[in-house]
UniProtKB/Swiss-Prot annotation:
Protein name in the entry: Splicing factor 3A subunit 1
InterPro entries noted in UniProt: SF3A1 (IPR045146), SF3A1_dom (IPR022030), SF3As1_ubi (IPR035563), Surp (IPR000061), SWAP/Surp_sf (IPR035967), Ubiquitin-like_dom (IPR000626), Ubiquitin-like_domsf (IPR029071)
Molecular functions per Gene Ontology: RNA binding
The UniProt record lists the keyword Ribosomal protein: no
Residue numbers of Phosphotyrosine PTMs: 456, 759
Function recorded in the entry: Component of the 17S U2 SnRNP complex of the spliceosome, a large ribonucleoprotein complex that removes introns from transcribed pre-mRNAs. The 17S U2 SnRNP complex (1) directly participates in early spliceosome assembly and (2) mediates recognition of the intron branch site during pre-mRNA splicing by promoting the selection of the pre-mRNA branch-site adenosine, the nucleophile for the first step of splicing.
Length: 793
């Protein structure tokens, strides 16, 4: 070919070839810059983000939009994948790359790296061998096992430098001299506070133990420690690999932690997004009363608990333990007894014996049933599939047989305590659990629960409970005090009374008297009043505290010359009123209960004509032809019937007792016996029936009255001012008793609900007025503490 055409042909090709050569070398830059020129509205991301976008676009182009949705769900919190959102500025570039990858115009993501990075990768790929590249690729493998812990690192506690040096020096000596040195040091310095860290309860003991272990490893190093240190000193690369592995492990742990937190956050967000009230009722199933369903029988709580235990053991041990842990019912026991053979019965007997004796060796023997004593039929020749070859079989070794129960062996029944044959123990246990006494105990416990739980009590029980409550709570229902005392007295009779003992010192006499009078009931108070009135004979020695002289003259029937002997324990009678001279006809009078002395028993005196002879009689006897004076209408209804009068001759004067006891109070002047109506009003025991009507009392008495309140002396109630003082109030007769309680509360601090007021033997109520109780000027009201349930101290 001529030179001309040859020279002329090359110039045109170089024009297209020169731009083609750089396009092959700079394919990525041209692809990135080429679409930017014709396409308007595409924002190109920076190089590090562009690489991720290109890779994602290539995967989405190959795998479809489902892969994009999966990436968007997995990387919802990763800001590097925000280009997947339609509102992101790089989303248009991402869609453009996806379309190019689908059309085959774009290359793989590796070509999308900038030019400078491509040149560096090409140079490094040319320099590094293939093995090194494989190692670089394998560095991203997730570490499986944690790195070994540091052996010579222990964070020092926050103590002073001197104490830290003491701990370290002690650890060095213990590591050098051994545990014997530590024991001697603990015994020698047990009182030295600086060595308290040697005690296991101390907070520095763990740190001291770590130091001892570290110093021991240094002083007495393990076998492979020197070779390991020598190897690491010769090859620093191995140390760097260990450091890198630790760093990767730390990063892996951090990633796992973040992943768990993200999963928890996703779960929380998912739960928060659920509208739990937005549901649709698909179908409603109504069970009719006459409908019969294939449902299991109802279970008791005991059976349910047994099933739960069986399930837990099944999950823990598997199917092998299910038969041993199974709880069998009575019907299953009967079926097994009929179906099983005598060897199985022996196995069950062995299990019962193991349950009673509870030894570990026999529990192990339960898993492998012992060979029965009864002869077994010879087994059939084994088939090849059933042959089991034991390699450790020794025919000469003696086989330890677990103890089997002898035919005449007896076991003690845990229910009745009787000796039962071992072969019949299981049947005895089954029958013993059906004892009717157990049913009675169960019914009794059910009744106790029903009585405790008043919700299930029938109407009659509720009525009786309210009636009993009303009889005891007078502060609520206002029942008479006598009825309360009766009810509470009936309860107190059943309780043993606590006896108060005096220690013999005069200083404790008053306190012992208060303790002795603490449990006095209303009936005892009535008896004391009767004794004070002389209606019944009394034994004063019962109320005295301390040693007393024995009775020199016991009570005995009177001799013929005397009618009655006065009890020796009564105080002496200084003077007996001589009755006036009476005419000869027989006339009998009964001396009424006149309080001659504080507590002397008064005998009724009967005069007889002179010369008459009286036959001997007992101290208390009904005399014939005696005109008994009837009781006045003002007598309280609570008083017991008076004893029959005693007949005394006219000229008879009772002799004083041999052993006189001094009276506790001065004797009032003696009054003549007949006028019973002339008793002072304050001496009578009043009731509400004997009071004057309120309107009549107001007509007779006008103006305010002065009332005295006797406060008890209660030193144990320090919050109230109860020192035995007397409070004086001036109130109109129309005021209620509650006004007095308010004033007492203001003066002493004692709440009105705790106050109990008594006026002349009557417990006054808050709702009544002063005129209702006929309170005159100078009336004395006694204050007491109201106990819960009406009990009085």
């Amino acid at each position: 070919m001529p030179a001309g055409p040859v020279q002329a042909v090359p110039p045109p090709p170089p024009v297209p070839t020169e731009p083609k050569q750089p396009t092959e070398e700079e394919a990525s830059s041209k692809e990135d810059s080429a679409p930017s020129k014709p396409v308007v509205g595409i924002i190109y991301p920076p190089p590090e983000v562009r690489n991720i976008v290109d890779k994602t676009a290539s995967f989405v182009a190959r795998n479809g939009p489902e892969f994009e949705a999966r990436i968007r769900q997995n990387e919802i919190n990763n800001p590097k994948f925000n280009f997947l959102n339609p509102n992101d500025p790089y989303h248009a570039y991402y869609r453009h790359k996806v379309s190019e990858f689908k059309e085959g115009k774009a290359q793989e993501p590796s070509a999308a790296i900038p030019k400078v990075m491509q040149q560096q990768q090409q140079t490094t790929q040319q320099q590094l061998p293939q093995k090194v590249q494989a190692q670089v690729i394998q560095e991203t493998i997730v570490p499986k096992e944690p790195p070994p812990e540091f052996e010579f690192i222990a964070d020092p506690p926050s103590i002073s430098a001197f104490d830290l040096d003491v701990v370290k020096l002690t650890a060095q000596f213990v590591a050098r001299n051994g545990r014997q040195f530590l024991t001697q040091l603990m015994q020698k310095e047990q009182r030295n506070y600086q060595f308290d860290f040697l005690r296991p309860q101390h907070s520095l003991f763990n740190y001291f133990t770590k130091l001892v272990e570290q110093y021991t490893k240094i002083l007495i190093p393990p076998k492979g420690l020197f070779s390991k240190l020598k190897k690491e000193a010769e090859n620093p690369r191995e140390v760097l690999d260990q450091v890198c592995y630790r760093v990767e492990w730390a990063k892996f742990q951090e990633r796992e932690r973040k992943k768990e937190e993200e999963e928890k956050e996703k779960e929380r967000v998912a739960y928060a997004q659920i509208d739990w009230h937005d549901f649709v009722v698909v179908e409603t199933v109504d069970f009719q009363p006459n409908e019969q369903g294939n449902f299991p029988p109802p279970t008791t709580p005991e059976e349910l608990g047994a099933r739960i235990l069986i399930q837990e053991r099944y999950e823990k041990f598997g199917e092998s333990e299910e038969v041993e842990m199974e709880v069998e019912s009575d019907e299953e026991d009967d079926k097994q007894e009929k179906a099983e053979e005598p060897p199985s019965q022996l196995d069950q007997d062995t299990q019962v014996q193991d349950m009673d004796e509870g030894s570990d060796d026999e529990e192990e023997g339960q898993k492998v049933p012992p060979p029965p004593e009864t002869p077994m039929p010879p087994p059939l020749p084994p088939t090849p599939d059933q042959v089991i070859v034991r390699k450790d079989y020794d025919p000469k070794a003696s086989k330890p047989l677990p103890p089997a129960p002898a035919p005449d062996e007896y076991l003690v029944s845990p229910i009745t305590g009787e000796k039962i044959p071992a072969s019949k123990m299981q049947e005895h246990m089954r029958i013993g659990l059906l004892d009717p006494r157990w049913l009675e105990q169960r019914d009794r416990s059910i009744r106790e629960k029903q009585s405790d739980d008043e919700v299930y009590a029938p109407g009659l029980d509720i009525e009786s409970s309210l009636k009993q409550l009303a009889e005891r709570r007078t502060d609520i229902f206002g029942v008479e005090e006598t009825a309360i005392g009766k009810k509470i007295g009936e309860e107190e009779i059943q309780k043993p009374e606590e006896k108060v003992t005096w220690d013999g010192h005069s200083g404790s006499m008053a306190r012992t008297q208060q303790a002795a009078q603490a449990n006095i009931t209303l009936q005892e108070q009535i008896e004391a009043i009767h004794k004070a009135k002389g209606l019944v004979p009394e034994d004063d020695t019962k109320e005295k505290i301390g040693p007393s002289k024995p009775n020199e003259i016991p009570q005995q029937p009177p001799p013929p010359s005397s009618a009655t002997n006065i009890p020796s324990s009564a105080p002496p009678i200084t003077s007996v009123p001589r009755p006036p001279t009476m005419p000869p006809p027989v006339r009998t009078t009964v001396v009424s209960a006149v309080p001659v002395m504080p507590r002397p028993p008064m005998a009724s005196v009967v005069r007889l004509p002179p010369g008459s002879v009286i036959a001997p009689m007992p101290p208390i006897i009904h005399a014939p032809r005696i005109n008994v004076v009837p009781m006045p209408p003002s007598a309280p209804p609570i008083m017991a019937p008076r004893p029959p009068p005693m007949i005394v001759p006219t000229a008879f004067v009772p002799a004083p007792p041999v052993a006189p006891v001094p009276a506790p109070a001065p004797m009032p002047p003696v009054h003549p016996p007949p006028p019973m109506e002339d008793e002072p009003t304050s001496k009578k025991l009043k009731t509400e029936d004997s009071l004057m009507p309120e309107e009549e009392f107001l007509r007779r008495n006008k103006g305010p009255v002065s009332i005295k309140v006797q406060v008890p002396n209660m030193q144990d109630k320090t919050e109230w001012k109860l020192n035995g003082q007397v409070l004086v109030f001036t109130l109109p007769l129309t005021d209620q008793v509650s006004v007095i309680k308010v004033k007492i509360h203001e003066a002493t601090g004692m709440p009105a609900g705790k106050q109990k007021l008594q006026y002349e033997g009557i417990f006054i109520k808050d709702s009544n007025s002063l005129a209702y109780y006929n309170m005159a000027n100078g009336a004395v009201i006694h204050l007491a503490l109201k106990e819960r349930g009406g009990r009085k101290k």
